[in-house]
From Swiss-Prot:
Keywords (A to Z) from UniProt: Nucleus, rRNA processing, tRNA processing
Gene Ontology molecular function, alphabetical: ribonuclease P activity; ribonuclease P RNA binding
Record carries keyword Acetylation: no
Similarity comment text for this entry: Belongs to the eukaryotic/archaeal RNase P protein component 2 family.
Matching Pfam families: RNase_P_Rpp14 (PF01900)
Disulfide-linked positions: none
Subunit structure, interactors included: Component of nuclear RNase P and RNase MRP ribonucleoproteins. RNase P consists of a catalytic RNA moiety and 10 different protein chains; POP1, POP4, POP5, POP7, RPP14, RPP21, RPP25, RPP30, RPP38 and RPP40. Within the RNase P complex, POP1, POP7 and RPP25 form the 'finger' subcomplex, POP5, RPP14, RPP40 and homodimeric RPP30 form the 'palm' subcomplex, and RPP21, POP4 and RPP38 form the 'wrist' subcomplex. All subunits of the RNase P complex interact with the catalytic RNA. Several subunits of RNase P are also part of the RNase MRP complex.
Compartments reported by the entry: Nucleus, Nucleolus
Key word Manganese present: no
Record organism: Danio rerio
Gene that this sequence comes from: pop5
SUPFAM superfamilies with a match to the protein in the record: Rnp2-like (SSF160350)
Annotated function: Component of ribonuclease P, a protein complex that generates mature tRNA molecules by cleaving their 5'-ends. Also a component of the MRP ribonuclease complex, which cleaves pre-rRNA sequences.
Protein name: Ribonuclease P/MRP protein subunit POP5
One annotated GO biological process: rRNA processing
Length: 169
């Protein structure tokens, strides 16, 4: 049995109106990604995307705008370089201007999840500086503490930090 090595692109979907995030589904992101690869890399990109790329939107959180895209290891740069060409997503007849911010490239879903926890904790710490009232600060501190406790519990049970990010050339 052959194992296909994959890369996971953890992206942040940035939109002008956060209320429009609930409109998106994974197939909308997939179609936009397919079109972007076609525009950026032409016939070669379209052929690679359809035949060998193995692109799949594994996770889309409509509340936070986090997208996890899986693609083959040999061609992940093709997808990665096409992300800036996505300027809007269209769903149910509505076009929403957006862009993708790739925040992590990992070898497994697990390493991407670990990075996302660390990233969210950093974002919460930045939010703490912007809080104006003591109640807001207390809520953000509780959120930071809950992220930290979950991370510590996960590291105690895991024991390994190997993410398999080595590349074959």
């Amino acid at each position: 049995m052959v194992r296909f090595k994959s890369r996971y692109l953890l992206c942040e979907l940035c939109v002008s109106e956060p209320s429009s995030l609930h409109l998106f589904e994974d197939k909308v992101v997939y179609q936009a990604l397919r079109g972007a690869v076609n525009r950026a890399h032409g016939d070669y990109g379209a052929a690679i995307f359809n035949i060998t790329l193995g692109v799949l939107v594994k996770y889309l959180n409509a509340h936070t705008g986090v997208v996890l895209i899986r693609c083959r290891k040999a061609h992940y740069r093709l997808v990665w370089s096409s992300l800036p060409f996505i300027t809007f997503l269209e769903n149910r007849g509505q076009k929403v201007r957006c862009f993708f911010n790739c925040i992590h490239v990992g070898g497994t879903i697990r390493t991407s999840q670990k990075f996302l926890i660390k990233y969210n904790r950093q974002q919460l710490q930045r939010m703490l500086l912007d809080c104006k009232t003591d109640a807001e600060k207390q809520d953000v501190r509780k959120a930071i503490l809950s992220c930290s406790l979950n991370l510590i519990k996960g590291e105690e049970t895991d024991g390994s930090d190997d993410d398999g990010d080595e590349e074959d050339t």
